[in-house]
Design a protein with these regions (language model features):
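Helix C-cap/helix->beta junction micro-motif
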Residues: 8, 113, 172-173, 288, ...
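PLP-dependent enzyme catalytic core of the Aspartate aminotransferase-like
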Residues: 135-136, 311, 319-328, 334-368
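A short helix-loop-beta submotif of the ANL/AMP-binding
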Residues: 111-118
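Conserved PLP-anchoring active-site segment centered on the Schiff-base-forming lysine
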Residues: 88-110
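Conserved PLP-binding catalytic core of the aspartate aminotransferase-like
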Residues: 274-275, 288-324
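Active-site phosphate-binding strand-loop segment of PLP-dependent enzymes
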Residues: 122-191
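N-terminal small-domain helix-loop-helix segment of the aminotransferase-like
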Residues: 1-76, 84, 133, 261, ...
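PLP-dependent aminotransferase class I/II
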Residues: 205-297
């Protein structure tokens, strides 16, 4: 879809590349680190300034206290953290529950490791947790749950009440909980991001995964992190080292500078900015006759595109690109069992001029 979008000169709202401006302190410190010679391998768990900055950030924003020496692992992106943790803690044949719609990387990682993903659908429309469905999906082979909050692709933000219910089941069945909190600062309309590890009884069983790719608009730098009980960190760190060695050294320094130097207002202002972007794209989708499911967080919108010609979501995506010049992802990428054929995902992490152009194209103005 990206290649075809480039060919026709359209606007790419398919990829979650986040091409907004990188905060100046992050860029400056990374460049300095390169010139200072910080271009070789780091410790497998990352440089001390970044681990310490992550620990301070977690205490301030997530109300989670961790030891930067024994409970923080800098990873080559959040996805690398998930891969290493799955390698370390799960076995072929284990079952792991994903909430649907899901992020495709989670599903494909489990499949690659011969672990069985079990999809538990969230309620259509408002994406509420169906506790009965979740309870029914747990079997003697269930080893873990994956919670992506705020979520890609639907912007689901799990409420504290929902997470407490999940935590109770995790305790009852002795399950790991893998979180993906990469969009933690992209939460709208006064909602609260709750880190599952902060709930009673969850610290030891939760593998908390996040990163700075989205927050600092550095998706190509591959800087993520993982926190967990020291009991699990040795094995997780071993598999991350075996697979990735370490996250890029100079980019670790740049990321640490961002965490240390940027004020709290940076994060609140960013949430307000992205809420405005969300409102802009949702308004354009409504005007185009494509009904959006307004996201509570993250920076994607799932929209009902049943009015577009085409028998499948991929055909509808091609129709939209051909007729309106806007690229989106087929909804079937986020569902099992043939669901999602009438859905497309749009990413609104774009510069304002690009997003405005996409909205104009969706409305039928200025077609390519």
């Amino acid at each position: 879809m990206t290649v075809e979008c480039d060919r026709v000169g359209g606007v790419n709202l398919a990829q979650g590349v986040c091409d907004t401006e990188v905060p100046p302190p992050v860029v400056r410190r990374a460049i300095e680190a390169i010139h200072e010679g910080n271009n070789i391998y780091t410790r497998l768990d990352g440089i001390a300034p970044l681990r310490e900055a992550i620990a301070r950030k977690l205490e301030r924003d997530n109300h989670l206290t961790v030891d930067p020496e024994s409970e923080v692992l800098v990873t080559s992106g959040a996805t690398a953290g998930f891969y290493a943790a799955a390698l370390a803690l799960l076995d072929p044949g284990d079952e792991v529950i994903l909430f649907e719609p899901f992020y495709g990387y989670h599903l494909n990682t489990l499949l690659a490791l011969r672990i069985k993903p079990v999809a538990v659908p969230l309620a259509d429309g408002n994406w509420a947790l169906d506790l009965d469905r979740l309870r029914a999906a747990i079997t003697p082979k269930t080893r873990a749950l994956v919670i992506n909050t705020p979520g890609n692709p639907c912007g689901k933000v799990f409420s504290r009440t929902e997470l407490e219910a999940v935590a109770a089941l995790a305790e009852e069945h002795d399950l790991f909980v893998f979180t993906d909190e990469i969009y933690e600062y992209f939460v709208f309309d006064g909602r609260e991001h709750v880190s599952p590890a902060t709930l009673p009884g969850m610290a030891e069983r939760t593998i908390s995964i996040s990163g700075l790719s989205k927050t600092f608009s550095i998706t190509g730098w591959r800087i993520g992190y993982l926190t967990a009980n020291p009991r699990w960190m040795g094995a997780i760190g071993y598999f991350h080292d075996l697979t990735y060695v370490c996250a890029p050294s100079p980019f670790q320094y740049g990321s640490a500078a961002g965490l240390m130097e940027l004020p709290v207002s940076f994060y609140t202002d960013m949430a307000a900015e992205y809420q405005a972007k969300r409102d802009l794209i949702c308004s354009a989708l409504v005007d185009a006759g494509l009904t959006p499911s307004v996201p509570a967080g993250a920076y994607y919108v799932l929209a009902d595109v049943s009015s577009l010609p085409g028998a499948t979501a991929k055909e509808k995506a091609r129709t939209l690109l051909r007729e309106r010049g806007v690229a989106a992802v087929a909804g079937t990428a986020f569902f099992t069992g043939g669901r999602g054929e009438n859905l497309l995902r749009f990413c609104f992490a774009k510069r304002d001029d690009d997003l405005k152009r996409a909205c104009d194209l969706l409305r039928g103005a200025g077609r390519v």
